[in-house]
Amino acid sequence: EYRVPKTKIPRRGEQAAAAAVRLPFSLRFIGGKGSAASTPRVRLSSEHAAIKFEVIPMEYYHMGTYDVAVVGAGHAGVEAALAAARLGCRTVLFTISLDQIANMPCNPSIGGTAKGHLVREIDALGGEMGKAADVCFLQSRMLNRGKGPAVHSLRVQADRVQYHNYMKQVCEKTPLLEIKQAEIAEIQTESGRVTGVVTSLGAQYTVSAAVIATGTYLNGRIHVGQVSYESGPDAALPSRPLGKNLQELGLRMRRFKTGTPCRVHRRSIDFDAMERQDGDDHIVPFSFGSDPSRMHNQVSCYITYTNEETHRIIRENLHRSPLFSGQIEGVGPRYCPSIETKIVRFSDKPRHQLFVEPMGMQTEEYYLQGMSSSLPEDVQLAFLRTIRGLEHVEIMRPAYAIEYDCVDPTELRASLESKKIAGLFGAGQFNGSSGYEEAAAQGLVAGINAALAVQGKPAFVMDRAQSYIGTLVDDLVTKGCEDPYRMMTSRSEYSLILRQDNADQRLMPLGHALGLVSEERYQHMLEKYQLVAQEKKRVEKTNIAPSPEINAFLESHGTAPLATGC
């Protein structure tokens, strides 16, 4: 029973009374063991100054039997579901919204330093992210060209909507994979093993394994200035009951935070006042099966900088930032700080770089990379208009911070299976990582191992010495993380040999043995490296004498000239 002042209860019947009273708590009811976690039917009556609630537990109804259930259809969930289905398991992929499949709620880009290595490795194992990026890219650049080839990293700006459509269609057309729009509220277990999942509507699915890939949806809360509200990314519905259910199952949970910049309108940007950044003339695909001759850059990106006036406005409004007021409790990403954090942490810097990047070909939205913020919207507009080229900028979507629940990754084995519950796997931001590429890599590993577990086969565990994916998983499950984990080349002690250009040689045999890489594709890789071996032998037998022409060529490529023959 909840009591309210009489003046707040109208005399038009209990339905009007129910609508008029704003309750300081949620009507969502989490049932005990054996009952549904759902939004219950509620009977209301207004008597004197009280409203009474009678909770009626929702009954289950069975909706199907599957081998593997994947909860969440972001970058981790999509790769997990595709891998499990392609390995012969009847798989069901759950998402709160079909319109959010493989969504890019932050930067619409794929790759980057170390992240490009992950995408290449995903492709070599038979994953989908590299193919999708090649189809949907707007601009392609190879980063770190001034350094050695071990740290060359491919990065593309992607069309956000096209990427979503591509991945959604791939999932829809994959045999043995079904997609359901539903919120999973409960993981059912028996004798320490996963037996099923239940939706918020009471639909029960019998499964042998489940992959949790909830991203930032799990108890998500958005912050913009002093305003905060329950939400997933991009104002999507959050997932609330599942978090409590996982705690009841004994998983050790924690609270992390991330953020995203605002999106601005193209026509309000003065591109002539900015530094233009074009894509590479020679495009290198992410997927080893893509044809580079059919790939072309479509757009340019732009660079501009903050200044002292920008920093002054931010400093004067730090008291309105939930990051500094204590409103946000979650731990944020160390290597992707908000602009207000940069101003405080690097107070000696007179300016900070930002990149102005398109969101797609069918939209006027632009993304401001490097300007993540949780300051109020009016402050965001004020400091943006101090930046060269953004003096008349118009905000289409304000920047925000989002808090979410995730698991302590040391709760997981190297297969990404829970140490406490057999058949329960974690992937992506649920495991404490950040980034689309890190999520997709874990999703692939979790999906493979969920399928192998159902089939009674040994787990697939990748070694640090053979891949960045192995390094990523090993770091998470053995060292854990106190803030969202980001992959970097410096995290691998084998970085000199784990180049992105030899990912196929390193990992495609594993993908082929699993059944994710076709025989045709595998043979093509073997033929490629037979030619490489032949060329190495030819070069070893060839002597080159120093000459002005040869030395000029070597020096133009940053290599020392020859003094003697070789």
What are these regions (language model features)?
Residues 367-433, 461-474:
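A glycine-rich dinucleotide-binding beta-alpha-beta segment and adjacent secondary-structure elements
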Residues 439-460:
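Internal hydrophobic alpha-helix adjacent to the cofactor/substrate pocket in enzyme cavities
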Residues 491, 497, 508-513, 517-566:
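Extended, charge-enriched "interface" segments that sit outside catalytic cores
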Residues 82-188, 201, 209, 213-230, ...:
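Conserved N-terminal/central alpha/beta ligand/cofactor-binding core
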Residues 15-24, 33-34, 38, 52, ...:
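Compositionally biased low-complexity segments, especially N-terminal hydrophobic helices
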Residues 62-76:
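Beta1/beta-strand and adjacent pyrophosphate-binding region of the FAD-binding site
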Residues 244-254, 309-328, 357, 371-401, ...:
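Flavin-binding catalytic cores
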